[in-house]
Amino acid sequence: MKNSLKEIYATCLIAFMMISCQSSHGQDAAQAQRDRLFNAYMEVKKDITDENFAGGKGHVVQLEKEVQNFRLKGLQLDDMMRLKKVSQTMKSDAASLKSAEDMKAMKTSFSAVTQSLFTIMETMKCTDEAVYLQYCPMEKAYWLSYDKEIENPYAASMRNCGQLVKGMATGDYPEPVACH
């Protein structure tokens, strides 16, 4: 009897460890997916900031690929339902970004992708680093940044123009303010 209890205990322990390892591996894969998406986004942002349309087109292809492959995993049902619609919007906006024929169209689509990505990041905790949502009142456009300091990708002649918006969901953005 003691041997069979030990065997049952050992079997349960092994099963628990296997499930834990699979869960950890799944979390690592999900985090890697989120990292690829956000890194692709940041490459496009850099190209837009540098007014590098040709280089941006190459990075946009990678961003659109990451957006299309992005899966919503490990969420509560209500978050899943809400983010499914946001994810579909982001896919459509990424396709528009990919088909942009000039820098102005690229910037417009990039702002739309930003708003969807921020909503997803906020819910899924996509990065351990501080990420800030920022806003350009002149262009009425958003972007994400690792820095609190404003480096506006939309206004080449006014790089410091903008405002910091932090921790707000889509639709809760403050009223635009004029730059000084």
Residue ranges and their predicted role:
Residues 1-7:
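Positively charged n-region of N-terminal signal peptides that target proteins for export
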Residues 3, 19-23:
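Intrinsically disordered, low-complexity segments enriched in Ser/Pro/Gly/Ala and basic residues
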Residues 9-20:
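Bacterial N-terminal signal peptides
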Residues 22-180:
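Intrinsically disordered, low-complexity terminal tails/loops enriched in metal-binding residues
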